[in-house]
């Protein structure tokens, strides 16, 4: 009583481990690196990437052979090449099954992301080429004023709304629940 339990993860909601989602008393989940806040599986807030930023991101990668992923409302959509051969693109062996279990195996991710540009929680760019990742990161930071960029592994560049991060989502949830941060 009086305690709110919140799980936070970079994963989209449906990819959260059962061991986390079955925690007795779990009230909220902050997922997709803070872009989504859910209560009992129902989305209560989403911080979407601006559609114009999605197009700028796609413009930045247009000439590069990179793997793209998109998170939409709790689901992962990934380039079919990555899903079928994740180790070839730097996926760590412990994430192999997670990667293979994504919900959308997309042949043309650029077209998919463009078509769904109004509903994206997060975009990941995956490449084993560090110089390419750094160039793309710099290019996207210059082109997009309304995004937050982070990395979870050496091969990932993760892009979300500037309104999204796990810390910002926790602040948003505390404000919504009228809980001061000193109580977190």
Feature map (PLM): residue ranges:
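Conserved acidic, metal-coordinating active-site core of Asp-based
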Residues: 60, 64-66, 71-184
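Active-site phosphate-binding/coordination module
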Residues: 1-93
């Amino acid at each position: 009583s009086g305690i709110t339990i919140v799980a936070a993860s970079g994963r989209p909601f449906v990819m959260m481990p059962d061991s986390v989602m079955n925690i007795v008393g779990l009230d909220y989940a902050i997922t997709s690196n803070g872009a989504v806040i859910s209560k009992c599986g129902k989305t209560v807030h989403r911080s979407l990437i601006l559609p114009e930023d999605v197009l700028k991101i796609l413009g930045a990668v247009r000439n590069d052979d990179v793997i793209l992923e998109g998170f939409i409302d709790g689901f992962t959509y990934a380039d079919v090449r990555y899903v079928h051969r994740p180790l070839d693109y730097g996926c760590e062996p412990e994430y192999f099954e997670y990667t293979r279990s994504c919900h959308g195996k997309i042949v043309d991710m650029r077209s998919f992301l463009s078509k769904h540009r109004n509903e994206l929680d997060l975009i990941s760019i995956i490449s084993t080429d560090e110089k390419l990742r750094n160039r793309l990161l710099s290019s996207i930071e210059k082109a997009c004023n309304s995004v937050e960029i982070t990395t979870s592994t050496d091969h990932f560049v993760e892009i979300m709304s500037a309104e999204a991060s796990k810390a910002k989502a926790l602040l948003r949830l505390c404000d919504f629940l009228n809980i001061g941060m000193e109580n977190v």
